[in-house]
């Protein structure tokens, strides 16, 4: 059979890795796909010194690839929202299958893109958009298809995980570790997407849609970053038997779905609590299988290329099949997607870590306990430290049982109004993941 002809748009880290893997493992890939996969054209603004593209035609215009009649599959690896969106729609319009690693594109424009792809009978594959080299999308969409997924939780941004790991292991401050992450290339010059949870929210949006069979709704995901975390809270969490991770959590409830990204205390004996550095991990809990864990490199040249090429193999296998018999993009048929709402954060339920800076006066603890009790908030554990020499304040650390967030909001407002409490109350959510 003739090889399938692929056009790669973007020859940066992932694009270069994809080209190299396709070239190096060409024979093995052909054996798996049933026919060869040939890179027939590349769109790139500049060469990649880590790639020997040889005689492969190169253009500076990505739309040359989308409009090339010889190309069967367009691989979109340019990133961003605008140009990538236009490129993918043009490729679909021209009847080409698409493989992308662009989580922002899928999270924000995926509903539109998948609808256009169905109209044209083409495939859009996006395994590499979440957690790099970990095939977690395929695991949820296909491997766990017998299950009603109850919840999933993931460390899905390597930059944030590197920062929190360094803060815990070496006692370093957030600004100090962020500067190193930027120097090492883990974080961008503008690290907002990584440290404020936007990148993780893109990925969580995709995972939740596949797990629960709901439309992509990135705009309804609650997002909270790690830039305000202090070494003190990392250390207190450690003393209580927890690790702080920047976690994406999606949960099915009777009222709707929770979709939230935020710093989270996890018991230190959980496997996911011990995922350190730039590595990623995703836990998925299904009613039949129980809890499963998927771990690996969440980024990088060839780990991400591994998922891109795996998608290419799947596309080659499925491109001649009847579109009605293909695995749906979001695991469920479009007319079977749930319309249950995404819950606002105030309606979500969690346990909470609260750090209160109390004045060294008698009766403050009793006042705190009364405020929590009046709002139906039960305390699981409490830790009081010695008064700090600098300002005479006593750090009071509480861990509550699970409760609706609105009650915690009300309690924090009342606590901060107490004369015996100084400054804002620190609140970090707690998940047992069992």
From Swiss-Prot:
Annotated residues for binding of Na(+): 127, 130, 132, 134
Active site: 203
Positions that bind NAD(+): 14, 33, 43, 300
Protein name, as recorded: Homoserine dehydrogenase
Domain ACT: start-end pairs: 353-429
GO molecular function: homoserine dehydrogenase activity; metal ion binding; NAD+ binding; NADP binding
Pathway annotation: Amino-acid biosynthesis; L-methionine biosynthesis via de novo pathway; L-homoserine from L-aspartate: step 3/3; Amino-acid biosynthesis; L-threonine biosynthesis; L-threonine from L-aspartate: step 3/5
Gene symbol of the encoding locus: hom
Binding site for NADPH: 13-14, 45, 103, 300
Family statement: Belongs to the homoserine dehydrogenase family.
UniProt keyword annotation of Zinc present: no
Binding site for NADP(+): 14, 45-46, 103, 185, 188, 300
CDD domains, per database record: ACT_HSDH-Hom (cd04881)
Keyword Oxidoreductase in record: yes
InterPro entries per the UniProt record, alphabetical: ACT-like_dom_sf (IPR045865), ACT_dom (IPR002912), Asp/hSer_DH_NAD-bd (IPR005106), HDH (IPR016204), HDH_cat (IPR001342), HDH_CS (IPR019811), NAD(P)-bd_dom_sf (IPR036291)
Top class in the EC scheme: oxidoreductase
Keyword list, A-Z: Amino-acid biosynthesis, Metal-binding, Methionine biosynthesis, NAD, NADP, Oxidoreductase, Sodium, Threonine biosynthesis
Required co-factors: a metal cation
SUPFAM superfamilies: ACT-like, Glyceraldehyde-3-phosphate dehydrogenase-like, C-terminal domain, NAD(P)-binding Rossmann-fold domains
Binding site residues for L-homoserine: 188, 199
Catalytic activity line of the entry: L-homoserine + NADP(+) = L-aspartate 4-semialdehyde + NADPH + H(+); L-homoserine + NAD(+) = L-aspartate 4-semialdehyde + NADH + H(+)
